[in-house]
Every structure is written in C-alpha cells, then in structure tokens.
Curated annotation (Swiss-Prot):
Belongs to the universal ribosomal protein uL13 family. This is Large ribosomal subunit protein uL13. GO terms for cellular component: cytosolic large ribosomal subunit. Transmembrane segments: none annotated. This protein is one of the early assembly proteins of the 50S ribosomal subunit, although it is not seen to bind rRNA by itself. It is important during the early stages of 50S assembly. Part of the 50S ribosomal subunit. Signal peptide: none annotated. Keywords: Ribonucleoprotein, Ribosomal protein. One of its GO terms (biological process) is negative regulation of translation. One of its GO terms (molecular function) is mRNA binding.
Length: 146
C-alpha cells in the first residue's frame, strides 16, 4: 500500500462533509494533512451548536474525572480529528488509519507550496442558513485563544 500525501484546505468547508471525504481518503491508505482547521464551518445557529458541544460538560461521575468521564474536544485540531475519527472503522485498522491524519491551525511553512485540495460539495456556498467556524466554537468552549 503506497502512502500518498494529500493536503486538504479546510477554509470555508463544512466540517461534516469534509470529514466524510477525509475518511474515504484514509480508508484508501493515503496520508491526509488538514490545514486551516480553525476556519472550517459547522452549520446551524451559533447558540444551538455551542449548546450541543457544551452539553456533555455537565455530565458528572463519582469516579476519578481524569479517568472515567466523557472527554469533549475543545481545540480546533481536536474537534476536526474527533469528527473524522467517528467516521472511521471502530477496530484496529481504523486506529491505524487515524494515525495517518494530521491537522494544523493555519498553514505550516512546509505545506505552503504543496497543492491543496478542496471539496466542492463541502463548500460553504451550499449553506443558506447560519453557521459558526470551528475557531469561534473553540473560543466559546474555552480551548482556543489566538
């Protein structure tokens, strides 16, 4: 299985639709690098999206919270990774595929000159309603300050 490098620009891309394409690339055995993760889009009114992501923070357990509670991603990198991880197989091969995913905030110097792909069906132009960026969501959840 040859490992090809695919660089995906997440700017103005709908997170869920982009994640399905990334999961398909990972299943094909390719290495995927996602840049501009903080500029990905989540559709829906801001209040509803934030409420959905922060709902799990209120879950409490009687055991050690570091070991046994539900952990919710707060940074843009982890939000994108978690979304893609949910679309991969839940077995050993899925774990190996997930290791081929790298996510960055902004564009690192080593990937500036690489050809970046965008997914047409994941473009923000499809949306008629409201949306929020992953960076804004992360700031509201307390995980991103830039």
């Amino acid at each position: 299985m040859s490992e090809q490098l695919v660089v995906v620009n997440a700017e103005n891309q709908i997170l869920g639709r982009m994640a399905t394409h990334i999961a398909k690339l990972l299943i094909q055995g390719k290495r995927v690098v996602v840049v501009n993760a903080e500029k990905a889009i989540i559709s829906g009114p801001r209040a509803r999206v934030v409420r959905g992501y922060s709902l799990i923070f209120s879950v409490r357990k009687f055991q050690n919270p570091e070991k046994n509670t539900i952990k919710r991603p707060r940074t843009p990198i982890n939000i994108v990774k978690r979304t893609v991880r949910g679309m991969l197989p839940k077995n050993k091969s899925g774990k190996m595929m997930f290791k081929n995913l790298i996510v960055f905030i902004g564009i690192p110097a080593e990937y500036k000159d690489k050809q970046m792909i965008r997914f047409e069906d994941a473009d923000v132009k499809r949306l008629k309603g409201k949306y929020i960026t992953v960076g804004e969501l992360s700031k509201l959840l307390g995980g991103f300050s830039q």
